[in-house]
Regions:
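N-terminal assembly/interaction segments in proteins that build large macromolecular machines
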Residues: 1-202
Length: 202
């Protein structure tokens, strides 16, 4: 019936009724029809920008999963998917975004799982960043609001040093979003521009 179909797919009342009618009451065929139409709708949504989202991670792994609204960013299924992707990276050994997208997640790939949830939720969802390191690492996740999952994440790979210092460095990176790691990396023209600005505003 309609309720059973909605429970199985997360589809709206009208979509579920329409699918059951088209499938002539066949529950499995109705699920298939809803999945096809949902994935088609998800494909149409990919031109909408996913600018909200969350970060998730564990030892040596950090990911960013994007959605269109912070409403979806709070969704338990969305947060759960982010955690599952982190576990998929840990299991597969994927080191970058492309390898992660094709990593197995249940009976599908990570990318297929993201597309499937996008079809259910009705928003463009996208795995946008993946970092995975084997050395000593420190993970810092920051919440912009108490009712939201972490939306800023920093994964620092380091050699030597103490955990307190590394934690402070990670917090500084989260707060300031630095472009360069060391003074030597900063191009001379950038230094000159900053000097001119500082002199003009002094």
């Amino acid at each position: 019936d309609v309720k059973k179909l909605r429970d199985a797919t997360g589809a709206g009342m009208m979509d579920a009724k329409k699918a059951l009618t088209e499938a002539e009451g066949d529950h499995e065929k109705a699920i298939e029809l809803l999945r096809i139409s949902g994935l088609a709708k998800a494909a149409k949504r990919t031109d909408r920008e996913a600018t909200n989202g969350i970060v998730a991670g564990r030892d040596g792994i950090l990911i960013q999963l994007a959605a269109e609204t912070d409403f979806v960013a709070k969704n338990a299924e969305f947060v759960g998917l982010a955690d599952q992707i982190v576990e998929a990276i840990a299991s597969s050994g994927a080191k970058d975004l492309e390898a992660t997208k094709v990593a197995p997640l249940g009976s599908a790939t990570v990318q297929e799982a993201v597309q499937s949830l996008a079809a259910t939720i009705g928003e463009n969802l996208s795995l946008v960043n993946v970092a995975s390191y084997d050395g000593d690492t420190h993970l810092y996740l920051h919440r912009r609001a108490s009712d939201l999952p972490p939306q800023v994440g920093v994964l620092v790979e380091y050699t030597g040093g103490d955990e307190t210092l590394v934690h402070q460095v990670a917090m500084h990176i989260a707060a300031m979003s630095p472009v360069y790691v060391s003074r030597e990396e900063v191009p001379a023209e950038v230094v000159e521009n900053e000097r001119r600005i500082a002199e003009a505003t002094a």
